Amino acid sequence: MAYEKNNGIVAVQPSGTSTWTKIPLKYIKVEEYKVTPDMMLDLDSYRQETGVLWRHVLDHKVTKIEFTTPHLYETDVTALLTIIQNGYTNTKSHRGKIRYYNPYTQSYKEATVYVPDIEFNINHIDEDKGTILYNPIRIAFIEY
């Protein structure tokens, strides 16, 4: 299966539902969208005194998805955060479920992820209009 417009590049499953809410591309700088699917995990890997690496690669693989938004006004930031936060099954740990397009398999996969802290940097405040414009924001989904 290839990329499907209706599924989007990444979607969030609202908590308690079986539906998906795709993250609209208007919130993603597509050229800065990064997916690292099926990353290997090591446990207690080490180098010998000769410099030879001994790896203990686990069977479990994880995916990391990162993207940057374009400059967004506060209303768009709120809309994007609502999509993401509606997917939290645990608000304390920012845990939720996503569906994403995996380039390795050319198919969609589901993952239980957490969203690391998000940093907001203001570009401009228009006091007359009462608007805030934010610089690009980095969003990440990291699989458990």
Question: What name fits each language-model region?
Answer:
Residues 1-144:
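Extracellular/virion structural assembly segments
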